[in-house]
Amino acid sequence: MTERMSGVLCPVVTPFDDDLNPDPARLIRQCEWLLSQNVGLAVFGTNSEANSLSLEEKLLLLDRLVDAGIDTTRMMPGTGCCALPETVALTKHAVNLGCAGTLMLPPFYYKGVSDDGLFASFAEVIERVADTSLHIYLYHIPPISQVGISLDLIERLITAYPDTVVGIKDSSGDWDNTNAMLERRWDDFRVFAGAETFLLRNMRGGGAGCISATANINPAAIDRLYQEWQSGEAGELQKDLDVIRDSTMAYPMIPALKATVAHFSNDQQWRRVRPPLVALPDDQCSALIESLLQKGFDMPGLN
């Protein structure tokens, strides 16, 4: 039986080559480094530029990661797409490869859809994948998707599929919303904060951890707070994490993360993003890195 996930996971940034094709070799190396820092892999998350990748590219990248020996029990790939058949195909592939979970956006192009419609969408995926090892972690990110997952919808899905719908990533940025989920006390339902900003509060409320963009660059420190959230140092650890995150959030997040990886890996290829995103300009890269270095920041072992 597949174990439910907890801890710190990273929506791994996706490297691109000169022709803007995904670069599997660089992605594999990055995933190996992240695993060495004790964080799991939420590939094809928002910060992975997932919705700038085709279904075929995602399927191939999953295959390449697994072929390289990346531990699938530490993987929660994002599989939610706008088109039902694509969500089914990607989810089924992830399950067949042995991924411990899938992080699933609702179909997000059409706005103002009802809970009935969203329930039907998730239910269709579950019924069509038809695999008892499927574990879905819902992905609530209304600032980006503009299609939210309500508490009532979560309740309906858990009631209908208690062994399949097992958790959620709350990227609403609204602690009251995350706390409302925790207060429902759903049986072994794993609530992940969408940023380490809320990690300490989430753990104190009975949460499972966090799935955070800045785990791409600060994984060990975030994991340390997850491991030591009950210690007397937890408050200071949280403050230290917030300082690094604030430095990164002063810039567009995905280009900033890639610029940071590029600098500390000594590999400028990492700065590439797919349109419509644009790479961080040189002057902003320099300012970001200088800000991080002034705080004693490093990414040991990356290069």
Language-model-detected regions and their locations in the chain:
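Active-site beta->alpha loop and helix N-cap motifs at the rims of alpha/beta catalytic domains
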Residues: 2-148
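C-terminal alpha-helical cap/extension of soluble enzyme domains
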Residues: 4-13, 37-38, 214-303
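A generic secondary-structure micro-motif detector
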Residues: 20, 51, 80, 188-189, ...
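Surface-exposed charge patches
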Residues: 32, 92, 200, 259, ...
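A general structural signal for well-ordered alpha-helical segments in protein cores
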Residues: 58, 62, 87, 122, ...
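Alpha-helical structural signal in soluble globular domains
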Residues: 60, 64-69, 93, 97, ...
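Catalytic alpha/beta core domains of metabolic enzymes, predominantly
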Residues: 130-134, 141-251
